[in-house]
């Protein structure tokens, strides 16, 4: 029986330069999709998958994330005075329980692998999930919950994957495939942002992982890889070399790349159309522009 996945790491230290000037004074992860910030969707997904402890790897200028997941007593009192108990209940229901959240700093932006390494003291000796808020997942069963179910069968390390055009493989970590049953893929290696002509497949990793704690040893000794950064995929490759299984899961649902402006807009439209109050009005607005 595999150790359960109870902890999740949220790397939120990035500068969000692609969204300037909006992100000059606001963390990218706090940009709203309809009525919730990006990071909230990721935390809700983790809660739905059974995660009990939430670790945020932050940097300077990210205090709005801390505030978002804290109590706002003045706001709560105002809502009570105005009889908006339904809004208050919704806010409280979305908060993790006291003691479930912790924060650590990534003082220098050295890449995703380094950000994950910064959480080593919080994670300890347990498997853990990593969720990148840039990837907003729209799934009937939450993406991470699908991954946890798969992990209970496979053990080892696991990532959510998508298939992309070969020309786009240079943007992702790409799997070197051993076997593929149509949903679960076993990999013999992972290549970070390869030349498309040399990519071992077109199956690429997106921002959802379940990882074994042994990765911290490799991240501690890692040399900068692609882009001069400490790459998480390089350390995952070391675990594969040591005999740990690595699988990719074709999740059921849609992924929106909200680190890209068009992806952000698409997510806003898609979730807006699904919103029970806003959907009909948004359809009317969109039809006026098409």
Where are these predicted regions, by residue range?
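Positively charged, low-complexity intrinsically disordered leader regions
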Residues: 2-8, 280-287
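N-terminal glycine-rich phosphate-binding loop and ensuing alpha1 helix
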Residues: 2-80, 106, 142-146
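Residues at the starts of beta-strands that form the adenosine-phosphate
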Residues: 7, 52-54, 100, 127, ...
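Structural beta-sheet core signal
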Residues: 10, 56, 130, 159-160, ...
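Alpha-helix/helix-capping structural signal
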Residues: 14, 60, 135, 142, ...
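Conserved beta-strand scaffold positions in the cores of enzyme catalytic domains, especially
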Residues: 30, 101-103, 157, 246-248, ...
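Conserved beta-loop-beta/alpha segment of the NTase-like Rossmann-fold superfamily
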Residues: 74-78, 91-177, 211-213, 219-222
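Catalytic-core segments of class I nucleotidyltransferases/pyrophosphorylases
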Residues: 129, 148-152, 181-284
């Amino acid at each position: 029986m595999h150790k359960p996945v109870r902890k999740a790491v949220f790397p939120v230290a990035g500068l969000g330069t692609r969204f300037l000037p909006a992100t000059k004074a606001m963390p990218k992860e706090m940009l709203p999709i309809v009525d919730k910030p990006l990071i909230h969707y990721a935390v809700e997904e983790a809660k739905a998958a059974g995660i009990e402890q939430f670790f945020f790897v932050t940097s300077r200028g990210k205090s709005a994330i801390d505030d978002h997941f804290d109590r706002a007593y003045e706001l709560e009192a105002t809502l009570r005075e105005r009889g908006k108990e339904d809004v208050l209940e919704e806010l409280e229901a979305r908060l993790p329980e006291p003691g479930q959240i912790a924060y650590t700093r990534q003082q220098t932006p050295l890449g995703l692998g380094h950000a994950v390494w910064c959480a080593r003291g919080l994670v300890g000796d347990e498997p853990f999930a990593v969720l990148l808020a840039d990837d907003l997942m729209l799934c009937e069963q939450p993406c991470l919950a699908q991954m946890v179910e798969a992990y209970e069968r496979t053990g080892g390390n696991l990532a959510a994957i998508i298939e992309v055009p070969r020309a786009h493989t240079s943007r992702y970590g790409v799997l070197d495939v051993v076997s593929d049953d149509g949903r679960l893929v076993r990999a013999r290696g992972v290549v970070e942002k390869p030349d498309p002509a040399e990519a071992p497949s077109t199956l690429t990793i997106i921002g959802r992982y379940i990882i074994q704690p042994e990765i911290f040893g490799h991240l501690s000794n890692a040399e900068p890889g692609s882009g001069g950064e400490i790459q998480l995929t390089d350390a995952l490759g070391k675990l594969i070399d040591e005999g740990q299984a690595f699988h990719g899961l074709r999740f059921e649902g849609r992924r929106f790349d909200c680190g890209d402006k068009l992806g952000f807009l698409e997510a806003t439209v898609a979730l807006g159309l699904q919103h029970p109050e806003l959907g009909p009005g948004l359809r009317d607005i969109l039809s006026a522009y098409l």
